[in-house]
Amino acid sequence: MADPVLTAGQYSIGHDGSSSAYVYGGSSVATAAGGILITNTAVDPGSINVQDQAVVGHDGMLFGIDTQPGMIVTQTGQTYTPGLPSVALDCYSALAGAWNDPTIRLADGAVQVLRACYAGSAVTRRTYGRGRKIMPTYGSVNQGVIPFVAQFQSADNTWYEDTLSSLTLTSVPSFAGSLTPPLTPPFQLAASTNYQQSTIVNTGSLPTWPVITFTGPVSYPVLAYVNTPVSVGYTGSLKATDVLVIDTRPWARTAMLNGTTSVAGYLNGSAMISMQVQPNSTVAHFGGTDYTGQSTCVVSWRNATLSIGGTY
């Protein structure tokens, strides 16, 4: 399934990758989806958590690490179905139901995706989190108008490109041919595999989080960023049918084998928080042991920015 396509001024909220995500808003009354008009979208980055310390015995301040809690996206809007109060109530109910979806709200760690094709933007962008308060005012419902304010708590302070980027790295056996008698011991057999490296390109203005997928057969697979100390690997073997997904995104931070078994305790190398892909180019190298040449490592990411829209 794929997310619904948005036109100018439209938004959607729902499960990641779901074609049934709720679409609302538009750049005009004629194009407003769901009978909803959004008049304003405001972003509050939240209060920065600081680790500053006073200089002992003198004026001044020693700065520590500043962290951000995740932005709050506040939308002000209204249902707009003139002369149709019952329809207005239905439109608000549909939006509020999607905003406070219990399949997300009551599931530990689950997130929604808020997508925006902001008026004036050439692209659709997204943020991950949960719909929180949505507050209607019913005084003008008889006119088919229900003003509301809705808040969305993001997992971080980032808008991500809607289009997913990916890079596939493969392995190539380092030996070829066969053994032909007569043979004289000791036999010299290849014990390694040549692996591919290529470039991850993050065209956004911020670092972004990769999702790393290893597919067997391979033993001790590892993904490393060349000319850096950063790498992540698995201390085990994957069969040809095995798929290991390492999701470094802050709202996930999981390592799942075949979608059901957590193997986070079997990872080695750098912590997931160190795996961010920096803006511009990062050379990635896939390593491990595979004598078939069939294993792969797929790195997927979304370019990251601070703006709800833009040209790319």
Name each model-derived stretch.
Residues 1-54:
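Polar/acidic, low-complexity leader/linker segments enriched in S/T/G and N/D
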Residues 108-161:
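Short beta-strand and beta-hairpin "edge-sheet" elements
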Residues 69-127:
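Long, hydrophobic/aromatic-enriched structural stretches that serve as scaffold segments
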Residues 57-89, 143-157, 282:
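Oligomerization/assembly interface segments of phage tail-like spikes and tubes
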Residues 162-312:
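Intrinsically disordered, low-complexity segments enriched in serine, threonine, and glycine
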Residues 37-74, 132-138:
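Short, solvent-exposed beta-alpha or beta-beta edge segments that form flexible loop/patches at the rim
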Residues 67-69, 106-108, 142-146, 202-206, ...:
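Solvent-exposed loop and beta-edge segments used for protein-protein assembly and interaction
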Residues 13-15, 115-123, 224-227, 288-290:
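Short acidic, glycine-rich loop/turn motifs
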